Amino acid sequence: MSPSEYALEVAKRRTFAIISHPDAGKTTITEKVLLFGHAIQTAGTVKGRGSSHHAKSDWMEMEKQRGISITTSVMQFPYGGCLVNLLDTPGHEDFSEDTYRTLTAVDCCLMVIDAAKGVEDRTRKLMEVTRLRDTPILTFMNKLDREIRDPMEVLDEVERELNIACSPITWPIGCGKSFKGVYHLHKDETYLYQSGKGHTIQEVRIVKGLNNPDLDVAVGEDLAKQFRQELELVQGASHEFDHEAFLSGDLTPVFFGTALGNFGVDHMLDGLVEWAPAPMPRKTDTRVVVASEEKFTGFVFKIQANMDPKHRDRVAFMRVVSGRFEKGMKLRQVRTKKDVVISDALTFMAGDRSHVEEAYAGDIIGLHNHGTIQIGDTFTQGEDMKFTGIPNFAPELFRRIRLRDPLKQKQLLKGLVQLSEEGAVQVFRPLSNNDLIVGAVGVLQFEVVSSRLKSEYNVEAVYESVNVSTARWVECNDVKKFEEFKRKNELNLALDGGDNLSYIAPTMVNLNITQERYPDVIFRKTREH
């Protein structure tokens, strides 16, 4: 393959994830995006819990029962001359570190906001993670077919709370029962909405020109007049779209629509393929790797168990950073210094697997893993380096785990260590006793762990509350001071799954006091894998 053909393939790639608060419509928008990418024929509206029509992107058994997307799956589809990789992120009230880490593997994010509710808690947290890498953000204001808040007010809230400038690309005409469509500020066109056509791609009627009398006929004179006045205000008060500001994560283009009604999603996709960056350079511990390099490099950001219920396998998800992957390729796993031949890599359409013949920078591939691959592992064609920026996040919830059958302690430890390597949960072993404490970012992780311990390791475990409210990884450059710190705080120290020392605090107040008392000790909220 010539360098110019390779460059063309890489330039076509767009890799993004969707971030939202639960129930803002993320799963629905995922489906509609796949519909436009012709990856599915009709959208199985997510009735979620217990209906036979399951959304394409929700699949492990527990998800099917509960109608939530626990696992981060990957879907690839063509759109507008590009090849789009969509990484689905767990979006339910209970999510996990997987969600955070997935955001480290994308070049762009789509933020979905329920226009009736505005900025919600989970959206804030996820935006903080995108800030670690200044990821570009597109915004989709959803649920325009319902009664919503004043759009200007919601934009103002996004700017204020998320510290990002908003540039409206489309603007709604009415909402709820009187929702008539959206006007495209860049194209000077109005797209008219028809309700009840959400399952398929609809032929949308377009009215060219803001002052076209056809618009008054289509939406009614009063609404048209009100809309034109509103638009004048919007154009006066909002930011012009600036591509550089978008790429640096300082400005977000905003699109309005209804994912359920399948309206406005294509405008957002057009913006994504036009403005979102092709695969970006990434830092390693020795240098920066650029997507156009010939040699293959990639890193593992997530490990998923039991994608195939018939086989107890685990699949490691790897983001290709540079070069071209080919079937049967020999790659160096840098951490273990071993060369492995990858003959059966996978590509995904959420649960439907197909074997990869080739993959390029920006793509995500799955590697079969029998416990030898860990999160953060770097694969190269021989070069010794490690990609950085794939962190562990300090858990926010903690439980003590206890066995129903004390003779199975060995299986429990093995299971917990493997689950922690996958990033399903974090394990802490206090220095002062024999407890096993598990830490998570979302409550659902505890359920996932106990059901997987039972099905995969034949271990029945129960959780008990424990007096821990937060954890920090600790280190210090002054050996003497660190020894003193360890001696005086032994009751609050624990080793995590990778034997890294951490401070487990009963309260935030305790943590703050300890940090003040030991200014030379570094307390970290994230830790590199």
Swiss-Prot record:
Q: Which residues form a coiled coil?
A: none
Provide the leader sequence positions: none
Its keywords, alphabetically, are: Cytoplasm, GTP-binding, Nucleotide-binding, Protein biosynthesis
Residues annotated as binding GTP? 20-27, 88-92, 142-145
Which Gene Ontology cellular-component terms appear in the entry? cytosol
Residue span, tr-type G domain: 11-280
Where does it live in the cell?
Answer: Cytoplasm
Alphabetized InterPro entries for the sequence: EF-G-like_DII, EFG_III/V, G_TR_CS, P-loop_NTPase, PrfC, RF3_C, RF3_dom_3_sf, RF3_GTP-bd
A GO biological process held by the record: regulation of translational termination
* MF terms (GO), sorted A to Z: GTP binding; GTPase activity; guanosine tetraphosphate binding; translation release factor activity, codon nonspecific; translation release factor activity, codon specific
> Which Pfam families does the entry mention?
EF-G_D2 (PF22042), GTP_EFTU (PF00009), RF3_C (PF16658)
Cite the Gene3D superfamilies for this sequence. Answer: P-loop containing nucleotide triphosphate hydrolases, Peptide chain release factor 3, domain III
Instruction: Give the main location.
Output: cytoplasm
Q: What SUPFAM superfamilies would the database entry show?
A: EF-G C-terminal domain-like, P-loop containing nucleoside triphosphate hydrolases, Translation proteins
NCBIfam families associated with the record: prfC, PRK00741.1, small_GTP
Please give the family membership noted in the entry.
Belongs to the TRAFAC class translation factor GTPase superfamily. Classic translation factor GTPase family. PrfC subfamily.
Q: What does this protein do?
A: Increases the formation of ribosomal termination complexes and stimulates activities of RF-1 and RF-2. It binds guanine nucleotides and has strong preference for UGA stop codons. It may interact directly with the ribosome. The stimulation of RF-1 and RF-2 is significantly reduced by GTP and GDP, but not by GMP.
- UniProt protein name: Peptide chain release factor 3
Q: Which organism is it from?
A: Yersinia pseudotuberculosis serotype O:1b (strain IP 31758)
Q: What is the lineage of its organism?
A: Bacteria, Pseudomonadati, Pseudomonadota, Gammaproteobacteria, Enterobacterales
Question: Its gene?
Answer: prfC
